[in-house]
Amino acid sequence: MEPGTKYREKGNTRMTEMMQQLKKIGIVPVVVLNDAKDALPLGEKLMECGLPCAEVTFRTAAAEESIRKMAKAYPDMIIGAGTVLTCEQADRAIDAGAKFIVSPGFNPKVTEYVLKKGVPMTPGVCTPTEIEAAMEFGLDVLKFFPAEPSGGLKMIKALAAPYVGLNFMPTGGINAANVRDYLAYDRIVACGGSWMVAGNLVKEGKFDEIGRLVKEAADIVKEIRG
């Protein structure tokens, strides 16, 4: 049996459609919310200013409720859950309305669990061994994490060479100064970044500033990808 075949029938179409949508958006804001009350004003700025998506990390107690609020208020927004480490967290995220799941590393148990539910999953990898293990699940888009500390774009290009058809979503150390280089490489679907949704800006309620940074990021995508 071809690697990953048993997972494709249920989830591959959704995965492909999701990745096509994310490629158009280009940059996925990686959000850490400590208070669910910030979810709606943040979601509003993301929708209004050109990046209608978010990876809400499961690092805080407010993550689940934040996803639920954003998913209900902005049904057209592509909301995912990041830093998902367990099957229990995956269930909570999906039940709250997450449309895709992201993990910092490759956990076969969690990956299989999410894919069997037919939900798009992007596990993190940074070595050939991890890539090949993930490809056994039929995945052709993987998170490259942590991007900059692991060699950045140069490393991604080196890894991409032997794995024809594999694409990446790099996260970690990507910012307004280096994101153009990543976006210009055709094997990158989208970049994850938190500079436009920095925790201090959210905490201080500076949503107009967040909106400005989001628009600036969206304009970079247009500049590079048209």
Q: What kind of feature is each model-predicted range?
A:
Residues 128-140, 152-159:
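Anionic-ligand binding region
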Residues 2-14:
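Short, Lys/Arg-enriched N-terminal segments with co-localized hydrophobic residues
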Residues 47-52, 73-76, 95-101, 116-122, ...:
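Glycine-enriched alpha-helix->loop->beta-strand junction motifs that scaffold or abut catalytic
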Residues 11-96, 116, 176, 204-225:
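Conserved N-terminal beta1-alpha1 strand-loop-helix module at the mouth
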Residues 86-96, 129-137, 175-189:
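Catalytic cores of alpha/beta
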Residues 168-176:
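Active-site glycine- and acidic-residue-rich loops that bind
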Residues 31-32, 53-60, 77-85, 98-106, ...:
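Catalytic beta/alpha-barrel core
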Residues 104-110, 143-152, 187-206:
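Glycine-rich phosphate-binding active-site loops on the catalytic face of alpha/beta enzymes
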